[in-house]
C-alpha cells in the first residue's frame, strides 16, 4: 500500500509539477523511502549525509520529506481507501476488519449497511480508514491515561481491547438472560470471525502530524494514541454494548447514557473533540429507527462485531453513504487546497531561508577570500624579505671570501718570508746546537764521572758500550745515549744468580704465598714501630712467626688487646670531644673521622655495645670483642638494607646519627626482633659440620642431582637446570643461580669433586643408581617438607642414621678416609691440655696420646692444611641456606657477601681454632682499622715533625764545622793512599774487635773503571763535633782528581752525609717505611730486627722484596758478599744501598754466625717442604711440636706460660666486680683446691680431682672470694704447680669460667635473690656447674644464675635474657631443671660466654654504696673520658714515679736502650728477674761511653721523688766533644715515651700505657685487668726478657714501615707502604735544611764482649739483645715500668 504511494510521490507531492523539476531515480527513491520509514522528520545531519550520498540539495530533501508526509496523510482518507479497495479487491478479501465499536454505540446505520453490503455483495468488507483509531480505542486510551496521570509511551506494551463477556450479575448485567446469551453465543460461533492482522498497523510508527492547523484532522491526540493500533478483541466495547442493550430493553431509548458501572469511561467527552474520527454531521443519522434497529441487532447478536444480514438490504442507507461520500470529497478538496496553499507558504519560507543562507555563505566566502588574499600578501612579503636577506648574506659572504683571499695571500707571502728566515735560523741553530751538544756531552761525561748516575741508565750505558765494543761508556756518542732503550732486552738478571736468594719460610702458609709473607713482615714492623704508642713489649720476628703456629699464643692475645684498646680509645676520644666541645687534643677534634664512625654505625646496626667492649676487654673476652668489632667494621657478613629499627628495652627517644650514636647504644637488640633476627643469622644453631646437608638448600639439591650422574658429573649450568626440574630448589628467586650452585659445590670437597673446569661430581661412595631417580627425588622432597614443617630436627644423629642415603657427616679432617663409617658413636678421641686431636703423618687419629716427661699428654696445634680444611664457611653453608630455604628475603644479611673467613671462625669456635693464615688476616684487618684512628695519626704527625726538626738540627751541627770538616776529609782522602793507582781496588780487612773498622772497607766492583770513595760517616755525624777519619776507604784516579780538583769529592761527600743524616733521624722517629735501599731493578732490601744488636736473630737476615712482589732472603755470608760486589756504586740507588750494606756488614755476619750456632739443624718441615729444598732458608725455626721431644717440650712450656698468664689475670682482684663489692655469704657453696685449683663442694672432705684433704681451719674460715685471692697471691709468689697439675683435668677456659661463675654466685647479696632460689635449687645449680664440660653448658648455668637475681639488683642498662627474648618475668626460672632459654645469637665460645658473664657481673649491684665508689665507672655517662696518654707533654704535668723506677735510674752502667721498648733488668713485672743475678758489666772492663747524671725523678734520702732540673741550652763547640751530652736529659723512666730536645728548649713526649699514677680516677676501667704483666719478670709476651747494654749508634738499623692512618688492611701487602710520604722520599735532597745549630755526638764503643744470657718464661736460656746507650739513639723506646706491676703495690695488680 505504501509502495503505490511512493511511486506517485514525485507527481502528487506538490500538487503541480514544475517545468524544471527532475524525476528522482529508483535508487534515490529507495534510499529516501528507507530513511523515511526510519525517521519521517530527519535531522540536519541526516539530510546532509543524504545530500552527499544522493547528490540532492537540502531543499530538495526537505520538500521530498514534506510531500511524503502529506501523501501519508492523504492515504488515510475513505475515498482513497475505497479506490484502493476497488483497484485491488483480491488483496482485501482475506482481511475482515472489525466493526467499530463507536459506530454501534452512536447508532450509526451507515456502518451497518456497509457491513451488510460488504458481506452480501462482493464479499469485500468495508473497512475504516487506514490508521484511524476507533472510538472505543480512543476512549480506552483516554481512560488509562487519566488513571495513570500521564500519556502512554510509544514503546510501551499493547493496550488490550478485547475481553471475555462479563458474567451474569457483574456490573449491572442481568442475572438471567439465558436465551439471549445462548443465541448470541450461537450466532457468534456460527459466524466465522477472522481477525485482521494488526501487526503492520502496530508496527507502523505514525509520525507527528505536520499540518496541525487543519481542523478536520485529529491533531489533538498525541503520538501515543495515534500509534496504538485498534484492538479487535473483546473488551470495553463489548461491555458498553451489553449495557446499552440492557438500557434499551428497559425502555430507556430516549436518554441514552453510559452505565454507571463505568464511571470514568465517558465516551461522550470524546465525541466532541476535534480529533475524533466521527464528524458532528453524523448526528442526523441518529434516529429512532436506527435505535430500534440497533436494539434488535443487539438482541439478536450480543456481540456488536457480529454482522447482521439485514444491513445488506437497506437501500436508504446507501444514499446516505453517497451523500456522505460527496461531503467527504468536498472536504478533501478543501483540505487539498489548503495544503497546497500551506505548501506554497512553506516553499516561499524555505526559499527565503535558502536565500538568506546563500547570502551568509557568500559573505563567509568573501571574508575567507579576503583573508586568503591578505595571507598570500604577507607570505609574499616575507618571501621577498627572506630573499633580500639571503642576497645580502651572499654578498657579505662573497666580500668576506674576497677579504680572506687577500689576507691569505698576504699571509702566505709573509709566511714564506718567515719560513725562509726560520730555515736560515734553524740552520744556524742546528750548527750552534751541535756544537753545544758536543760541549754538553763533554760536560756531562765529566760530571757523570764525578757525580752519581741513575742506576738503570748507568747499566744501559755499560751494556751499550759493551755491545759496541767500546773501552768505556765515556766513548758513547750522542745518538747512542739518546737511544739507550734499545738495549733493555740485553740487560742481565739482577740480583745475579751468584746471590743465592732463598725462600724465608718452609712451612705453610708462608711457603706458598708471598702475600702472607708480606703481611707477616709488615704487621710485625707496624707493631714494633708503634710499640711505645700501643704499649707493647718488643719481640722478635721469630717469636711473632712462632705465635701464629702455637695453639694458644700469649703474644697474640697481648697484641689484639692493645690494638682493640687503641681503637676503642679513638672512638671514645672523638665522642668525648663531640659531646663536650673541648678535647684533650685538638687533633682529635679536628679529625672526627679518626673515631671510626663506620665501626660505630656498624655496632649500632648489629646491636653491639661499645661501652661493654671498653669495660670488659681482657684476656678472656678479647676474641668475642674482636668478632663484634669485625662485624661492625663490615669484615663479616653484610647486613641487608632493611628498614628495621631495633628498639631496645631501655631506648628513650634515641636518635641515630654520626655524633651521638655512641651515647644512644644499648646493649643487645630489640626484644621483639632479637630471636627471629639472630636465628636468621644462624647464630642460634650449634656448630655443625661443613659437610652436612640441610633440606631445601642449593647444596642439598645439587647433591641429590649429582649423585645420579656418575663419575662424569655435570657442569654448573646443567646442575642448575636439573635442580630446577627436580623441584628440590626454586632457583628462579635467585638472580645468579649458577653462582649459588658453584659456591655450594666448590666449598665442600668431601662430597663433591671437580672433574673438569666448572664440572663436578659426587664422591664414589655417595653415588646412586640413576634408575632410582624418582624415588630419591621423592624422598628428598619429603625431607624438605618435613624440615620446613618442623617435623625433622636435622641434627648430626639424624644424618648418622641416613648414612646409606649419602647424607651423613664425614670427618672434618681432610686426611681422614671419606669411607669412614659412623656406626661407632663414640670414636676414640684424645683430649689433652690443648684440646685438639693428635694426628699422625698418615692423617689417622692417633689412639695413643703423646706423653711428655711429666706424663702429660701433648699435642701441638693442627697443621695449616688441616685447619684450612677443618673449618670452612659453616655459617655461610648452614645459616644462610636455612634462611634461604624459608624465603630469599628472610635472611638479614647478604648471601653474596660473607666477609672474612676468620670472622666466621670466631663464631664457630675460639681463637685457637683459627689457622695461621686466618690469624694473620685478622691482624691485618685489625691494624687496618687502627691506622685509621687518631692515635696512630697523631703519633705519625708528631714523629714527622720531630724527625724533620732533628734532621735540620743534625745537619746544622755539621754545617757549623763545615770548614774544619772539609779540610779534614780532603786531607784524609788524599793522604791515606798516596801510591794508589787508577782502577785499583783497595780493601782493608775488617777488624774483629770493632765494627767501625769493618765498616770502613769499601769493596769496589772490578768492572767499575772509575771508583768512588765511600765515606764512613758513622764517626762523622753522631756528635756535636766531627772527628778525623782514621781510615778512609776509596780509590780514585789520582790524575783525574788532580785535574778536576776536590769539587766532586766534596759534593759526593755532602750528598752521602746528608742522606745518612736523614736516615738516622727517621730511624729514631719512624714515620714511614725505610728499607736499606734499592738496586737498579728497584728491588728493595729490608732488615727486620727489633734492635741493631747482633744478638737479635733478625740482624742476620736481609729480606729482598722483588719487583714482582716475591719475598726472598739472604742468610749467608757468600750471598751477602756477592750482593755487595755486584752493586755499582756509581748509581744513585745502588750507591746508597752499598753504603748501608757496608754499615751493617759486621753486625750481619756476626748475627748470622750466632744464628747458625744456635740453630745447627733445620726446622721441623718434614711434611711441608717444597720440591726445591735448596731454596728454602733454615734460619727461621718454627716449632710445630711433632718432630722431636725438644720441640714438644718447647710447645708445652709456651702453653704453660700462656696458662699462667690467663690464671694471673683472671685471679686478680680487679678482674670481677664480685672481688671488690661482693658480699661474704655465711654458707659458701664451693671451695677451690689450692693444689689443683678445681672446684668442689664445701662439704667434700677431699678434692675429688687430686684427692687433697682439706681439714685446715684457715681455709674453712675464708669465703670463696678470699680463697680465689689467696690462690692468685700464691701464683704471683711463684707457686705455679696447680697450673701443671690441673692441665690434664679440663680445658683452661672451662676451669676459669667455672671459677668466675662460682665467685659471682658466692658474692650475690642474699636479699637480691628470687624466692624460688632455694638451697636445694642452689645445690642443683652447683652440681650442674661442676659437671659442665662445654661452653654451652656454662652458658646455661650463667643464664640460670641471671634468672635467680632480682631485676632491682641489676643496672638499668643491663638487658636480661627474659627481656631480650620477650619472655615474661620469671619465665626462665619456671623449670630450671629442664634447661633454660638462652640468647641464641651469643656464640657458644669461651669469649662469648665470658663477655656475657663480665657484663652481667659489672651490672650487679652488690652493695648499696657501690655506686658511690669513685673508681666505679659511671653508667650515667657514656664513655667517661680518659686522659689522652699518647705523647703527653710533660712541661705542664709531671708524672709521679715509683721507687722501682727510681732504682732503675741508678743503674747507669746497664741502662736499657730506649730504642727497644727499654725493658729494664727488673723485668716485666717490675721485680728483679729470677735466676739471673745482677746485670753483668762489660767483659773488657770498659766503662760506658756515656755517663748519665742522676735522673730528674730520682728519690732523695727521704724516699720522696725529686724533679730533675731541666737541661741547659746547648752551646756551640766550646764544650768540646762531650759538651752536648752533659746537658742532655735522660728519658723519663717508667713510661714508654719519646724524649728529645729542640734547640735550647726541652721537649718531652711520653706515653703512659697502663700506669695508675698517670691515669685519672675514672679511667681505672682500662687497668682493672691489666694483661701486660708477668710476675716472673719475663720481658716479651712469649716469655723472653731482655737486658740491654751499650751499643753503637752505627747499629741502630730498625727502620719501620710508615703508616698514614688512612690506609686499609690490603695496604700491608707487598710494596704497599703506610707512609705519609712516598717510598723514595728519603732519597730527595732538602736544601732548606742548611742552617740549624745542633751537633751530633759520635761514640765509639767496643761491644765485642757484649754477651749476656736471656731467660725465657719457661726457663730456657736464650741470647738476649744488647744495645748501646748512645745519646743519639736514646729516643726510640723508653723503659716501661707499669706501676701496677711494681713492688710498690701489695700485688702485681693492686
Curated annotation (Swiss-Prot):
Official protein name in the record: Homeobox-DDT domain protein RLT2
Residues of the HTH HARE-type domain: 696-765
Annotated DNA-binding residue span(s): 17-76
Subcellular location: Nucleus
Residue ranges, compositional bias (Basic residues): 1471-1485, 1515-1531
Species name: Arabidopsis thaliana (Mouse-ear cress)
InterPro entries recorded: Asxl_HARE-HTH (IPR007759), DDT_dom (IPR018501), HD (IPR001356), Homeodomain-like_sf (IPR009057), RLT1-3 (IPR044977), WHIM1_dom (IPR028942), WHIM2_dom (IPR028941)
Stretches with biased composition (Gly residues): 1459-1470
Amino acid at each position: 500500500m505504501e509502495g503505490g504511494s511512493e511511486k506517485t510521490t514525485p507527481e502528487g507531492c506538490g500538487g503541480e509539477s514544475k517545468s524544471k523539476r527532475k524525476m528522482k531515480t529508483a535508487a534515490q527513491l529507495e534510499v529516501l523511502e528507507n530513511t523515511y520509514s526510519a525517521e519521517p522528520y530527519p535531522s540536519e545531519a541526516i539530510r546532509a549525509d543524504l545530500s552527499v550520498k544522493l547528490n540532492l540539495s537540502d531543499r530538495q530533501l526537505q520538500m521530498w520529506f514534506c510531500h511524503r508526509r502529506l501523501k501519508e496523510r492523504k492515504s488515510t482518507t475513505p475515498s482513497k481507501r475505497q479506490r484502493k479497495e476497488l483497484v485491488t479487491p483480491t488483496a482485501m478479501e482475506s482481511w475482515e476488519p472489525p466493526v467499530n465499536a463507536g459506530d454501534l454505540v452512536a447508532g450509526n446505520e451507515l456502518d451497518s449497511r456497509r457491513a451488510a453490503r460488504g458481506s452480501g455483495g462482493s464479499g469485500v468488507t468495508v473497512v475504516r480508514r487506514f490508521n484511524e483509531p476507533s472510538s472505543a480505542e480512543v476512549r480506552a486510551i483516554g481512560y488509562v491515561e487519566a488513571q495513570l496521570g500521564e500519556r502512554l509511551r510509544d514503546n510501551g506494551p499493547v493496550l488490550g481491547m478485547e475481553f471475555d463477556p462479563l458474567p451474569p450479575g457483574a456490573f449491572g448485567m442481568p442475572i438471567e438472560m439465558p436465551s439471549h446469551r445462548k443465541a448470541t453465543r450461537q450466532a457468534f460461533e456460527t459466524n466465522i470471525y477472522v481477525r485482521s492482522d494488526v501487526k503492520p498497523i502496530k508496527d507502523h510508527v505514525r509520525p507527528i502530524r505536520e499540518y496541525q492547523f487543519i481542523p478536520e484532522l485529529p491533531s489533538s491526540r498525541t503520538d501515543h494514541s495515534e500509534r496504538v493500533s485498534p484492538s479487535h478483541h473483546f473488551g470495553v466495547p463489548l461491555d458498553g454494548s451489553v449495557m446499552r442493550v440492557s438500557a434499551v430493553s428497559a425502555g430507556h431509548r430516549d436518554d441514552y447514557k453510559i452505565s454507571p458501572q463505568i464511571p470514568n469511561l465517558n465516551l461522550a467527552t470524546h465525541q466532541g473533540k476535534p480529533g475524533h474520527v466521527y464528524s458532528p454531521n453524523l448526528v442526523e443519522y441518529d434516529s429512532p429507527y436506527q435505535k430500534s434497529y440497533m436494539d434488535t441487532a443487539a438482541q439478536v447478536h450480543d456481540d456488536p462485531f457480529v454482522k447482521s444480514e439485514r444491513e445488506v438490504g437497506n437501500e436508504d442507507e446507501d444514499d446516505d453513504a453517497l451523500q456522505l461520500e460527496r461531503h467527504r470529497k468536498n472536504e478533501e478538496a478543501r483540505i487539498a487546497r489548503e495544503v497546497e496553499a500551506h505548501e506554497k507558504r512553506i516553499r516561499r519560507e524555505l526559499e527565503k531561508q535558502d536565500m538568506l543562507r546563500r547570502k551568509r555563505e557568500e559573505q563567509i566566502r568573501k571574508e575567507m577570500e579576503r583573508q586568503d588574499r591578505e595571507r598570500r600578501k604577507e607570505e609574499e612579503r616575507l618571501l621577498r624579505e627572506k630573499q633580500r636577506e639571503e642576497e645580502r648574506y651572499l654578498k657579505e659572504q662573497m666580500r668576506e671570501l674576497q677579504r680572506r683571499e687577500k689576507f691569505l695571500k698576504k699571509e702566505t707571502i709573509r709566511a714564506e718570508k718567515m719560513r725562509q728566515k726560520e730555515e736560515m735560523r734553524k740552520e744556524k741553530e742546528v750548527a750552534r746546537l751541535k756544537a753545544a751538544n758536543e760541549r754538553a756531552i763533554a760536560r756531562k761525561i765529566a760530571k757523570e764521572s764525578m757525580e752519581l748516575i741513575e742506576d738503570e741508565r748507568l747499566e744501559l750505558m755499560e751494556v751499550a758500550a759493551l755491545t759496541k765494543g767500546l773501552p768505556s761508556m765515556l766513548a758513547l756518542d750522542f745518538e747512542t745515549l739518546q737511544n739507550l732503550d734499545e738495549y733493555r732486552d740485553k740487560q742481565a738478571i739482577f740480583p745475579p744468580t751468584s746471590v743465592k736468594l732463598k725462600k724465608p719460610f718452609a712451612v705453610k702458609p708462608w711457603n706458598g704465598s708471598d702475600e702472607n709473607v708480606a703481611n707477616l713482615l709488615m704487621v710485625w714492623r707496624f707493631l714494633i714501630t708503634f710499640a711505645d704508642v700501643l704499649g707493647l713489649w718488643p719481640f722478635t720476628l721469630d717469636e711473632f712467626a712462632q705465635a701464629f703456629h702455637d695453639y694458644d699464643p700469649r703474644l697474640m692475645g697481648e697484641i689484639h688487646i692493645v690494638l682493640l684498646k687503641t681503637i676503642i680509645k679513638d672512638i671514645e676520644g672523638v665522642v668525648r670531644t663531640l659531646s663536650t666541645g673541648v678535647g684533650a687534643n685538638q687533633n682529635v677534634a679536628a679529625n672526627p673521622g679518626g673515631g671510626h664512625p663506620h665501626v660505630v654505625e656498624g655496632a649500632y646496626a648489629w646491636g653491639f655495645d661499645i661501652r661493654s667492649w671498653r669495660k670488659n676487654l681482657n684476656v678472656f673476652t678479647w676474641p668475642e670483642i674482636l668478632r663484634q668489632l669485625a662485624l661492625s667494621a663490615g669484615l663479616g657478613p653484610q647486613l641487608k638494607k632493611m628498614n628495621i629499627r631495633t628498639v631496645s628495652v631501655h631506648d628513650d627517644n634515641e636518635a641515630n646519627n654520626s655524633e651521638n650514636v655512641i651515647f644512644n647504644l644499648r646493649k643487645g637488640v630489640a626484644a621483639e626482633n632479637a630471636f627471629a633476627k639472630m636465628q636468621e643469622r644462624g647464630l642460634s644453631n650449634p656448630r655443625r659440620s661443613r659437610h652436612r646437608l640441610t633440606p631445601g638448600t642449593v647444596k642439598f639439591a645439587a647433591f641429590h642431582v649429582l649423585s645420579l650422574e656418575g663419575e662424569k658429573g655435570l657442569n654448573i649450568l646443567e646442575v642448575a637446570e636439573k635442580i630446577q626440574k627436580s623441584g628440590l630448589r626454586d632457583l628462579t628467586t635467585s638472580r645468579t643461580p649458577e653462582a649459588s650452585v658453584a659456591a655450594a659445590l666448590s666449598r665442600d670437597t668431601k662430597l663433591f669433586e671437580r672433574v673438569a673446569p666448572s664440572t663436578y661430581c659426587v664422591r664414589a661412595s655417595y653415588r646412586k643408581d640413576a634408575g632410582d631417580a624418582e624415588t630419591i627425588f621423592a624422598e628428598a622432597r619429603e625431607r624438605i617438607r618435613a624440615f620446613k614443617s618442623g617435623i625433622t630436627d636435622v641434627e648430626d644423629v639424624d644424618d648418622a642414621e641416613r648414612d646409606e642415603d649419602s647424607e651423613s657427616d664425614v670427618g672434618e679432617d681432610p686426611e681422614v678416609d671419606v669411607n669412614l663409617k659412623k656406626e661407632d658413636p663414640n670414636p676414640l678421641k684424645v683430649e689433652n691440655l690443648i684440646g685438639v686431636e693428635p694426628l699422625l703423618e698418615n692423617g689417622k687419629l692417633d689412639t695413643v696420646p703423646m706423653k711428655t716427661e711429666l706424663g702429660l699428654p701433648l699435642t701441638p696445634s693442627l697443621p695449616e692444611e688441616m685447619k684450612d680444611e677443618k673449618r670452612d664457611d659453616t655459617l655461610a653453608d648452614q645459616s644462610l641456606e636455612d634462611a634461604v630455604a624459608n624465603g630469599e628475603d628472610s635472611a638479614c644479611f647478604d648471601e653474596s657477601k660473607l666477609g672474612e673467613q676468620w670472622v666466621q671462625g670466631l663464631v664457630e669456635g675460639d681463637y685457637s681454632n683459627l689457622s695461621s693464615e686466618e690469624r694473620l688476616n685478622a691482624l691485618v684487618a685489625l691494624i687496618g682499622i687502627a691506622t685509621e684512628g687518631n692515635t696512630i695519626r697523631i703519633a705519625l704527625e708528631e714523629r714527622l715533625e720531630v724527625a724533620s726538626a732533628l734532621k735540620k738540627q743534625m745537619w746544622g751541627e755539621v754545617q757549623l764545622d763545615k770548614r774544619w770538616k772539609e779540610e779534614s776529609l780532603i786531607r784524609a782522602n788524599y793522604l791515606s793512599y798516596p801510591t794508589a793507582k787508577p782502577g785499583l781496588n783497595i780493601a782493608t780487612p775488617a777488624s774483629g774487635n770493632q765494627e767501625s773498622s769493618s765498616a770502613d772497607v769499601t769493596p769496589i766492583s772490578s768492572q767499575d773503571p772509575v771508583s768512588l770513595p765511600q765515606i764512613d760517616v758513622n764517626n762523622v755525624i753522631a756528635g756535636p763535633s766531627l772527628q778525623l777519619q782514621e781510615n778512609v776507604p776509596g780509590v780514585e784516579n789520582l790524575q783525574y782528581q788532580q785535574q778536576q780538583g776536590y769539587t766532586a769529592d766534596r759534593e759526593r761527600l755532602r750528598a752521602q752525609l746528608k742522606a745518612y743524616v736523614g736516615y738516622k733521624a727517621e730511624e729514631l722517629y719512624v714515620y714511614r717505611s725505610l728499607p736499606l735501599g734499592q738496586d737498579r731493578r728497584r728491588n728493595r732490601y729490608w732488615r727486620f730486627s727489633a734492635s741493631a744488636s747482633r744478638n737479635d736473630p733478625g740482624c742476620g737476615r736481609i729480606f729482598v722484596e722483588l719487583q714482582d712482589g716475591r719475598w726472598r732472603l739472604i742468610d749467608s755470608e757468600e750471598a751477602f758478599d756477592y750482593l755487595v760486589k755486584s752493586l755499582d756504586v756509581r748509581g744513585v740507588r745502588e750507591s746508597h744501598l752499598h753504603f748501608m750494606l757496608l754499615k751493617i756488614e759486621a753486625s750481619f755476619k756476626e748475627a748470622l754466625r750466632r744464628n747458625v750456632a744456635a740453630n745447627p739443624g733445620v726446622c721441623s718441615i718434614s711434611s711441608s717442604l717444597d720440591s726445591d729444598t735448596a731454596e728454602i732458608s733454615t734460619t727461621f725455626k718454627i716449632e710445630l711440636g711433632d718432630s722431636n721431644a725438644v720441640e714438644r717440650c718447647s710447645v708445652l712450656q709456651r702453653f704453660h706460660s700462656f696458662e699462667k698468664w690467663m690464671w694471673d689475670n683472671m685471679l686478680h682482684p680487679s678482674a670481677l666486680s664480685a672481688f671488690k663489692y661482693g658480699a661474704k655469704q655465711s654458707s659458701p657453696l664451693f671451695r677451690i683446691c689450692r693444689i689443683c685449683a678445681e672446684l668442689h663442694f664445701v662439704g667434700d672432705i677431699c678434692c675429688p680431682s687430686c684427692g687433697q684433704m682439706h681439714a685446715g681451719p684457715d681455709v674453712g674460715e675464708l669465703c670463696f672470694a678470699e680463697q680465689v685471692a689467696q690462690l692468685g697471691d700464691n701464683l704471683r709468689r711463684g707457686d705455679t704447680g696447680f697450673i701443671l697439675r690441673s692441665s690434664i683435668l679440663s680445658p683452661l677456659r672451662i676451669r676459669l669460667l667455672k671459677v668466675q661463675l662460682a665467685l659471682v654466685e658466692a658474692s650475690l647479696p642474699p636479699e637480691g635473690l628470687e624466692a624460688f632460689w632455694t638451697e636445694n635449687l642452689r645445690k642443683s645449680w652447683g652440681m650442674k656447674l661442676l659437671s659442665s664440660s662445654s661452653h654451652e653448658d656454662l652458658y646455661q648455668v650463667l643464664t640460670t644464675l641471671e634468672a635467680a637475681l632480682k631485676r632491682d639488683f641489676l643496672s638499668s642498662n643491663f638487658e636480661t635474657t627474659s627481656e631480650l627474648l620477650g619472655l615474661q618475668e620469671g619465665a626462665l626460672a619456671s623449670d630450671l631443671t629442664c634447661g633454660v632459654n638462652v640468647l641464641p645469637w651469643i656464640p657458644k665460645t669461651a669469649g662469648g660466654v665470658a663477655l656475657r658473664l663480665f657484663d652481667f657481673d659489672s651490672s650487679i649491684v652488690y652493695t648499696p654504696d657501690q655506686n658511690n665508689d669513685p673508681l666505679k665507672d659511671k653508667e650515667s655517662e657514656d664513655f667517661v673520658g680518659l686522659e689522652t696518654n699518647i705523647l703527653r707533654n710533660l712541661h705542664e704535668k709531671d708524672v709521679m714515679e715509683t721507687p722501682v723506677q727510681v732504682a732503675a735510674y741508678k743503674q747507669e752502667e746497664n741502662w736499657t736502650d730506649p730504642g727497644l721498648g727499654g725493658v729494664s733488668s727488673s723485668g716485666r713485672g717490675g721485680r728483679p728477674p729470677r735466676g739471673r743475678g745482677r746485670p753483668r758489666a762489660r767483659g773488657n772492663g770498659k766503662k760506658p761511653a756515656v755517663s748519665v747524671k742522676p735522673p730528674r725523678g730520682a728519690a732523695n734520702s727521704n724516699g720522696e721523688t725529686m724533679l730533675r732540673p731541666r737541661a741547659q741550652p746547648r752551646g756551640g763547640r766550646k764544650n768540646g766533644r762531650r759538651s752536648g751530652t752533659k746537658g742532655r736529659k735522660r728519658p723519663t723512666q717508667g713510661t714508654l715515651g719519646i724524649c728529645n730536645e729542640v734547640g735550647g728548649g726541652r721537649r718531652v713526649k711520653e706515653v703512659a700505657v697502663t700506669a695508675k699514677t698517670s691515669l685519672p680516677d675514672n679511667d681505672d676501667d682500662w687497668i682493672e685487668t691489666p694483661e701486660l704483666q708477668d710476675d716472673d719478670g719475663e720481658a716479651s709476651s712469649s716469655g723472653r726478657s731482655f737486658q740491654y747494654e751499650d751499643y753503637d749508634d752505627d747499629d741502630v738499623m730498625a727502620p719501620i714501615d710508615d703508616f698514614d692512618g688512612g690506609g686499609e688492611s690490603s695496604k700491608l701487602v707487598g710494596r704497599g707502604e703506610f707512609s705519609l710520604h712516598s717510598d723514595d722520599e728519603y732519597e730527595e735532597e732538602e736544601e732548606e735544611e742548611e742552617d740549624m745549630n745542633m751537633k751530633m755526638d759520635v761514640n765509639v764503643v767496643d761491644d765485642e764482649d757484649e754477651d749476656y744470657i736471656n731467660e725465657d718464661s719457661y726457663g730456657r736460656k736464650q741470647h738476649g739483645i744488647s744495645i748501646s746507650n748512645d745519646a743519639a739513639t736514646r729516643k726510640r723506646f723508653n723503659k716501661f715500668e707499669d706501676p701496677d706491676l711494681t713492688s710498690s703495690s701489695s700485688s702485681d695488680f693492686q
